[in-house]
């Protein structure tokens, strides 16, 4: 009965979405407030029914109801409760239900908290959201129904893919989907603006918080996925330029450009057409990512679907929304009035440069992702585009972007003083050069690329600090006055500085890990000692342990340095009998921002085992950077100016009239 309830709740959600996609538009056409208000009630009701459908699937997994095909294929009665729950979205059908649940959540949030929006705009936005929802409800019900029953129910399930039975899966996909789907709000605002033929600074003020929310979650989702791959796959890699990883990076790049473009539009009423186009392209790239994962066109640890019917259906959705939105843009963009002018050397000019570099970088990743797929489809020629391509194309573009980052916030709007900003950034530049010299001397005159990259990271961080120092007057004003100005500084200014500094932190981590990573790969027996980056790693023994739904072989390593024992590390290999597969569970020793990493291979008949030991200097900075960026986004989001909607004109103060 639970399965049937979940199914019919999804059908009712589809019916509500169809009503929401039509009636409010009729109301907007007729200027009927009652019909336009239908969008709000149907969006909230739709959220209720989709939420009920998702809860029903969770209950089926928790109860191990193997009469439902989705539960049978992806669960097991002995699986821990946490992984029963996360197994709901560890498969194609369940993950698509999570996708539409988050889509309904964002629509419900606009309905609930969009009271400051003009009624007509809110009706259009929610109608566009309903178009998207209707398409994906149909996709789930026709090709990917998670509530299908099995005629002769088995007594036990096949279990979830062992690689996905990890705490990271509880966090990574939901965060990623909150980012992917969150950009649908920016898309809907853009289409609504084109339909109404009106876009102004108020529109940018309304759309920026929703874009920022999606960007925060996508940033954290990508970082969490990278860290999950790092510790779960067993060989210490954190980014593989996998097509599905690229599919999450592309909307992040476009979304970052959109945030900065919307800022120009809000402050200077400029870049209107470009901001609308970015809103469309960002969500289009999210849809492309959905197609790559769900269509079966690629083979990846991230990919689920192999049914060609699903791929064709999603391709049709992709063509419908991307093609339709770009056609509407082409027809209506010329009617949008252009905003204010600005000099090339200005904050607007810096943000345009930011958008140019981010867009070109996104195009490079798009080419590297789709070109091999196109070659395989058109010429039956299999090829891959890996790190060497991106190191030669993407990395220089991002280096230029990082070099420009400290200048943007310090330039004035409309017309800036580049020489003056350069002088104010002199201390940050000197700090970067000093670090370059120190690192180059420490590496004894090796390649200059790594020291230069680290110096660039320091320059970005110091530039963010300099911006805050200049805004507060910490150097030129009395301390009490500077602190008072710091308290009055908008949270968005603090957030922007933290986000920019996070980029520098991540760059330093990436450079240190890739340049000075130490590796030891060998077969070890009991009492053997490996020497890695000053650490002595001794294998004390192997033992077996029975887990809830797996058998585990654990190796015990004693780790010491200069004769002092630091830790006992216990990496393992788990064999899952139900699936007949195994996973590697790495052991990590964290010291500061660096880590010692041990993973196991196969054991032989003599009792020896293959071992990988890595020392990864400052590797945690790779993920601390995105966390700092996301925190900066949250701080900006908490700024009251991003929560109250469009600014209202100040009322003129009434003068006191003398008594007659």
UniProtKB/Swiss-Prot annotation:
Q: What is one process in the GO biological process aspect for this record?
A: cytochrome complex assembly
What the entry lists under InterPro entries is as follows:
CcmF_C, Cyt_c_assembly, Cyt_c_biogenesis, Cyt_c_biogenesis_CcmF
According to its record, what are the GO cellular component terms?
plasma membrane
The answer on whether this UniProt entry bears the keyword Cell inner membrane reads yes
Keywords assigned by UniProt, alphabetized: Cell inner membrane, Cell membrane, Cytochrome c-type biogenesis, Membrane, Transmembrane, Transmembrane helix
**Where would you find the membrane-spanning parts of this chain?**
8-28, 42-62, 94-114, 123-143, 175-195, 210-230, 233-253, 273-293, 311-331, 350-370, 392-412, 419-439, 445-465, 492-512, 617-637
Q: What is the predominant subcellular site recorded for this chain? A: membrane
Any one Pfam family here would be: CcmF_C
Any one GO MF term held by the record is: heme transmembrane transporter activity
Q: Where in the cell is it found?
A: Cell inner membrane
Q: How does it sit in the membrane?
A: Multi-pass membrane protein
Record PANTHER family = CYTOCHROME C ASSEMBLY PROTEIN-RELATED, CYTOCHROME C-TYPE BIOGENESIS PROTEIN CCMF
Q: Which family does it belong to?
A: Belongs to the CcmF/CycK/Ccl1/NrfE/CcsA family.
Q: What does this protein do?
A: Required for the biogenesis of c-type cytochromes. Possible subunit of a heme lyase.
Q: What name has this protein been given in UniProt?
A: Cytochrome c-type biogenesis protein CycK
Specify the species.
Bradyrhizobium diazoefficiens (strain JCM 10833 / BCRC 13528 / IAM 13628 / NBRC 14792 / USDA 110)
Identify the gene encoding this protein: cycK
